[in-house]
Amino acid sequence: MTGKILLTMAAVALSASFGLRAQDGTTAYNFLNISPSSHVYGLGGHNISLIDDDVNLTEQNPALLGPEVEKQVALNYMRYIGDCNFMGARYGMRINDHSAWAAGVQYFGYGSMTATDVEGNITGSFSANDIAFSATYSHDISDNWRGGITMKFMTSNYESYSAMAIAADLGVNYYNPESDFSASLVLKNLGGQVKKFNEKYDKLPWDIQLGITKGLSDVPFRLSVTATNLNKWKLPYLKRSDDNSTTSPLQVKDSFTSNLFRHLVFAGEYTPTERIYLGLGYNYKTRTDMSTYSRNLLSGFSLAAGMKVRGFGFGVALAQPHSGATTFMLNITTNINELLR
């Protein structure tokens, strides 16, 4: 019965998506590409195949949600570029031995901005923010396969303008605990605006992702590769002809190799115990997106670390998504059942 519910919800989401995506406009809502999970953020920003009892991972792939997150609460906070602050909360609940649900909210605040008239005269200040609400359902298809769906509602408020959008994520995961191998496929941000800012509808950053994670048998280490933007092969970028000069001519990079690696995110984790992890991620797209600006050796790299202590899980991540802007993310998770013991 629950399997039929999952298929019905997926069909409705796809039907709604095709209708909404027919609207003309530009891509917006790129804040949906920022993961609220410090674990994922520190592994390159994308990972849809990571197996862990962390309800935050459902944001990457609804099929990663399972009964193991029974009554788990997760909080996240990130100081982003400039005065931007991202924060949110997520809660997971077991339905039965094969199904679970979760709900979450994410707030993206962009700080105070200067308001001007058409002649450039300062008239005051205003604030801007995005809020995303989500609900996730997952169900075990078999012993090794699990499917899931996330429905999202987004509202945007920029000065006196507002907009709303709906979207869905569809995911499936295969996991073999004996070989510690996980593989996932996710269709993200299928949907569109239901209320527009002006005369045109903005498109959502829809994405097809494929990922694998493999634990090594002899050492406590696991590797991940995640392919993103599979719905669009060409991802050209601009690069200075001289990396040491900010005024040298720009060149378009659009070779097969550059396109290939701009789709891929690589990550490795050291897990000495079930309670500790140390991770390193590399996102070539993030690094090359900064090619027109000054960048350093660490551009595109990110770090993640986490540990569980007395019923609480703590996760931190460091990354540099933009030139000269190092970001820090903090996650705190706990299980209500453990707190009440």
Model regions and ranges:
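Bacterial Sec-dependent N-terminal signal peptides
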Residues: 1-26, 268
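Subset of outer-membrane beta-barrel
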Residues: 21-341
